[in-house]
């Protein structure tokens, strides 16, 4: 109830000229008059309206200048709509940023807030680029994709799941194909359903997989040959991850409540870490050979220094159900997903939740989680992909998969569908996300 008056006081105290907040406030009141362009500048009323005579040149059907203004107007209108939709969220973002700097005359934090404004309005929609199918039998509904990962150069991506197959596709070929009939460059058959895959960041073509029998397998993805197998887990293995610093090191987590550390140079595990409950996911800090995060069925995220595994460095508490995924946004921030239908943002130096993300539905399945460092993508049990910006709690974009039905199910309503988005992967250095659902449909999507 007191957020808006406090926000107004901050605006009056700290800003004597047109500022980020004034533009934001004016946009909400009169979206035709102002808009944020770049860092704290404004677009005047006469320039924002392409129909204004002073901004148009004579000529058949308007000029190039007029066309550019029309395009600019439509773009800004889209951004205005998103700012208005997330206005309360932006207030909270502003307050949390500014209150960290208690000096009355300080302008610290404004740059971060400006960057948040710019980044969260960067994309307005999701555009499909290509469609693939993981299913071996189009009549078989059990073709859940459990994991999608790009290789170290973002040239190839692998898809794995319950059909026991790992399919490797060349990204450039998939995008360039005119028709949506795509063939993998290689295909590997496993002995059990696959839960997770991870590419080596050093050896081109080296891929690790974990499966429902508890086996961790190292593959040469281009020859399709098994390089090594590790079989120490006693139950289903949910997650596997290559270390980006020590490129011979691999971690795996299992229902046997153990995290195993492997070296591709050794035949047996080099470290065995005992957890308090089933381990659903493991992820190395991308800048460290020693630091590992794991998500557990006891609702917690644990952060370990592998040089001393007796106690975790930090335990992140806040989820109400099992933690299914953990991903690092950067070297200090990580995001977790849980079957409590929430994502949570954490900082390794602080034990409390930085932000919760709500909007998607996730109560029982692994639905995928990916990030490019600023945006977070996750699946949902309503057969949709959700995109969040790390500075805001509500989703900024959503893409719904089509429901494919057989003859017996054609009269079912879409909301009665049991399909869910099951795997998500970000193509790093780009705005491309690859997502798959429980029917085995894979979409290559671009944020625009």
Residue ranges and their predicted role:
Residues 166-172, 197, 216-220, 240, ...:
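WD40-repeat beta-propellers
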Residues 135-143, 187-194, 231-237, 273-279, ...:
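WD40/WD-repeat beta-propeller blade N-cap
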Residues 149-154, 197-204, 210, 223, ...:
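Loop/turn segments within WD40 beta-propeller blades
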């Amino acid at each position: 109830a007191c957020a808006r008056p406090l926000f107004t006081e901050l605006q009056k105290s700290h800003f004597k000229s047109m500022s980020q907040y004034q533009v934001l406030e004016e946009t909400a009141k009169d979206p035709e008059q102002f808009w944020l362009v770049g860092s704290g500048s404004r677009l005047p009323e006469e320039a924002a309206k392409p129909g204004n005579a002073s901004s148009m040149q004579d000529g058949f059907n308007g000029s190039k200048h007029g066309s550019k203004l029309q395009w600019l107007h439509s773009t800004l209108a889209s951004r205005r709509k998103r700012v208005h939709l997330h206005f309360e969220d932006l207030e909270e973002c502003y307050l949390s940023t500014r209150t960290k700097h208690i000096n009355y005359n300080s302008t610290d934090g404004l740059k971060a807030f400006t960057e948040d404004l710019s980044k969260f309005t960067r994309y307005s929609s999701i555009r499909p680029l290509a469609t693939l199918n993981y299913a071996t039998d189009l009549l078989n509904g059990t073709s859940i994709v459990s994991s999608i990962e790009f290789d170290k150069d973002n040239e190839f991506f692998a898809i794995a799941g319950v059909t026991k197959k790992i399919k490797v596709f060349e990204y450039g070929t998939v995008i360039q194909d005119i028709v949506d009939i795509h063939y993998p460059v290689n295909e590997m058959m496993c002995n059990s359903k696959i839960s997770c895959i991870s590419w080596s960041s050093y050896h081109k073509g080296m891929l690790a997989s974990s499966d429902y029998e508890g086996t961790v397998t190292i593959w040469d993805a281009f020859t399709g040959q098994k390089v090594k197998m590790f079989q120490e887990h006693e139950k289903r293995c949910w997650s596997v991850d290559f270390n980006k610093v020590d490129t011979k090191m691999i971690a795996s987590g299992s229902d046997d409540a153990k995290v195993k550390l492997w070296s591709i140079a050794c035949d047996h595990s080099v470290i065995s870490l005992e957890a308090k409950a089933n381990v659903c996911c493991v992820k190395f800090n991308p800048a460290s050979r020693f630091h590992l995060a794991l998500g557990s069925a006891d609702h917690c995220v644990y952060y370990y220094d592998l040089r001393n595994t007796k106690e975790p460095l930090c335990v992140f508490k806040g989820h109400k159900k099992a933690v299914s995924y953990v991903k690092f946004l950067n070297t200090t921030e990580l995001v977790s997903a849980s079957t409590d239908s929430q994502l949570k943002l954490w900082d390794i130096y602080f034990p409390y939740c930085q932000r919760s993300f709500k909007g998607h539905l996730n109560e029982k399945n692994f639905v995928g989680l990916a990030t490019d460092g600023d945006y977070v993508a996750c699946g949902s049990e309503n057969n949709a992909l959700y995109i969040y910006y790390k500075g805001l709690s509500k989703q900024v974009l959503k893409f719904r998969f089509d429901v494919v039905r057989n003859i017996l199910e054609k009269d079912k309503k879409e909301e009665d569908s049991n399909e869910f988005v099951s795997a998500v992967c970000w193509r790093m250095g780009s705005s491309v996300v690859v997502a798959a659902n429980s029917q085995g449909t894979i979409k290559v999507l671009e944020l625009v």
